[in-house]
Regions:
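Active-site metal-binding loops of divalent metal-dependent hydrolases
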Residues: 41-43, 55, 60-62, 98-100
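A short acidic, helix-capping loop that chelates divalent metal ions and anchors anionic groups
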Residues: 66-71
Length: 157
């Protein structure tokens, strides 16, 4: 590890104990105001950056259409649903995740909420994340129209 990177957190960090709360509500990005938005679900500390001038939400891993909630640091689908409901109230047109090379329309949030609602009591398929840090869980595929929407959870209900 090079000296400047000693403070970096490796993926799979032991207990994620060295992550702290981001304590700034907004920042100016060269005459463009940005707001920090909490997006818990994928992880407790997930945040997004809302850029009102662009009507865009940068969501990191929190709003991927295949919602991954099966690692030790992931939260429940109930928490994910609350986040989706909050996001639904925001005034944006598109969002960008960290795992895709395209913007998604806000309308996809509705389908993600329906996916969680539909998943209760439905058939899930065994799932195993194929590389370290490996995690097992269950996959529910809700729909495959324009963009596939699904849910991966650690335990079925």
């Amino acid at each position: 590890m090079i000296p400047e990177q000693e403070e970096m957190i490796p993926f799979g960090a032991d207990g994620w104990h060295n992550i702290c709360k981001l304590d700034i509500p907004s920042f100016d990005l060269g005459e463009m105001q940005c707001q920090i938005v909490p997006l818990p679900g994928h992880t407790e500390g997930s945040v997004g950056i809302f850029i009102p001038a662009l009507r865009l939400l940068l969501s990191g891993d929190a709003l991927t259409p295949i919602m991954c909630l099966n690692f030790q640091n992931h939260l429940t689908k109930e928490v994910q649903m609350k986040t989706l409901q909050c996001v639904q109230q925001m005034d944006f047109d598109y969002y960008l995740t960290s795992h895709h090379d395209k913007c998604f329309p806000k309308a996809l949030i509705d389908r993600m909420m329906k996916c969680i609602e539909h998943s209760y009591g439905k058939k899930h398929y065994a799932y195993r994340y194929p590389q370290p840090p490996y995690a097992e869980g269950y996959f529910y595929l809700d729909s495959v129209e324009e963009e596939a929407v699904g849910l991966i959870v650690a335990e079925m209900d």
